[in-house]
Amino acid sequence: GWTQIEQCPFGKETPAKAISDGYHLWQERGAVEAQNNLTDIGRALAKLPIDPRVSRMILAARDMGALREVLIIAAALSVQDVRDRPQEARQQADAAHVKFADPQSEFLSYLNIWRWFEDAVAHKKSNRQLQELCRANFLNHLRLREWRDVHSQLRTQVLEQGWRENEIEPTYEQLHCALLTGLLGNVGFKNEAKPLPNATAQ
C-alpha cells in the first residue's frame, strides 16, 4: 500500500501546492506532526469523513462540553446561508432578521434561527404554512431543510463514535473556543503598529 499521499495514483496530476496546502491545513489543526504523521487528533478526525475544519471544531466541542450546539453551527457552516436577502427587499429582509441576531456573535445567530425553525416545525399545521412562515421571515425553506439534514448526518456520525451531547448549555467561551479550533485561518489580530491579516500570516 501507499504510505504517503504523494504516492497515491490520482486520476490526474495533482499540483504539489494542493498537497502542501492539505498538510498545512491538518498541521494547523494539530492533526499531523512535523513529519506529517497523524496525531491522536488526526486519527479522531479521520473517523469523521467531513471537512477537517468542521470535524476539528466538532472534536473540540466534544472535549469542551459544547457538542450539541457546535453540531448545529457546523451544519450551518456546511450549507448555503439560510437567510434570504433579495436585492429588491433588502431592508425588509434585514428588519426580519433582526430577531435572530445576537450582538455578541454571528454563531449565536445560527442557534437562534435553528431554535426558531425547530419550534416552527413542531407547531406547524401544514407544510405550506411552514413555507409561508419562512418566506415571511426571509428564510429559505429548502436550505433550512438541508441544514437539518446535514445536522442529522453529523449527529449520527458522532453518536456512532460513542460521543455524547452535552445536556448543560455551554458558556460563551466554551462554545467559541471549540469553533475557533476549526477556523484558525480566519482569526484576525488587532495590532495598532502592524496589523496582520489573519492568524496564518507570516
Where are these regions (language model features)?
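Second RecA-like catalytic domain
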Residues: 1-202
